[in-house]
């Protein structure tokens, strides 16, 4: 944001029903109210998630409708909604085809990085959708806030995902966080470097990383409103990524236990019933503490396969493979 005179930093204040962005650039105040959302429509859109996840998504979509409007260069810039390359609202007169092509390119780049880092079929991944959505939200190709946000996304999503989906134990090597983040923020083309550095970032430093992202964003001139959106986004992305990785782990676990997951998921009630039975009898599918390494998790699940198969078989024979 540019301005003359004694420019002050906008503030984002939040209440239970609305968010208000106040700024003094250009001598005016922007007041933004969140738009009502159809919870049924949102719930249907994310039908693959369990109720706990649906609550997270609904809360994020409801509360951030106002938050996702940021003042950039003296004008408000509305965020994109879902990410597919489709036109944004009121885009027809603003080079819609060109912007849609850019969004497709962003999506392809993110999915390529996901594939190279072991995420199967990333185009169907909620993690992929969330990352591309946040990039599209500002429609900016190279912006330090977006790079910092991608850092949070990568650290949170892939680190948590690797706990469940990767045989490789995450390295606990130390990393100089301020240097890492400073380099990432100063270079807007380092998403691949973020991905490459993940195995060197211990879980316990995630909160330090988030703090450093905020500090560096502030030091490089980013405004408080954008910083608030960045941090809020990283938290919601974290929650969704953790849940997505857990869903993937559960499905892989069910398959390896002789359960026909595709058939089971056709009945969402039966699917939740089986998962609930497993979680009540064993804590193995509950989020593991940070000190629990992946090989320990695999040892625990190895003894539970018969119970898993029988849990599905009692509902219907068609849910088990021969």
Curated annotation (Swiss-Prot):
Q: Where is the composition biased (Low complexity)?
A: 11-22
- Superkingdom is Viruses
Which key words tag this protein in UniProt? Answer: Chaperone, Host cytoplasm, Phosphoprotein, Viral RNA replication, Virion
- Location(s) in or outside the cell: Virion; Host cytoplasm
Q: From start to end residue, where is composition biased (Polar residues)?
A: 1-10, 74-84, 107-117
A GO CC annotation recorded here is: host cell cytoplasm
Basic and acidic residues biased stretches: 28-46, 60-70
Main function: Non catalytic polymerase cofactor and regulatory protein that plays a role in viral transcription and replication. Stabilizes the RNA polymerase L to the N-RNA template and binds the soluble protein N, preventing it from encapsidating non-genomic RNA.
Official protein name in the record: Phosphoprotein
